[in-house]
């Protein structure tokens, strides 16, 4: 819902074209909601007959797996906005005042350089 057939076709084509790639993954969240993602994962597990649901069960049934290392938030906003709620648990965030349409390679490189300097503690 909310995405044109042409765009869906382009997204399917891009997914097919990159299916065999094994390097870095980039996820674009288009028409996405984190609460709905978690709800659908839990409902799927219930439909499969699960009576005790673990974190690992949910992780394996959400849209993206594995968890994200870095979440880049353009636009100057510093909030989750229902974005990757499950996957963001141990992610590092990088905020930019640059709007997404204006986001350039140099902005990405800056985010990656700063991420490289961080001491990730994964909740510890």
Q: Each predicted region: which residue ranges?
A:
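Flexible, compositionally biased loop and terminal segments
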Residues: 1-124
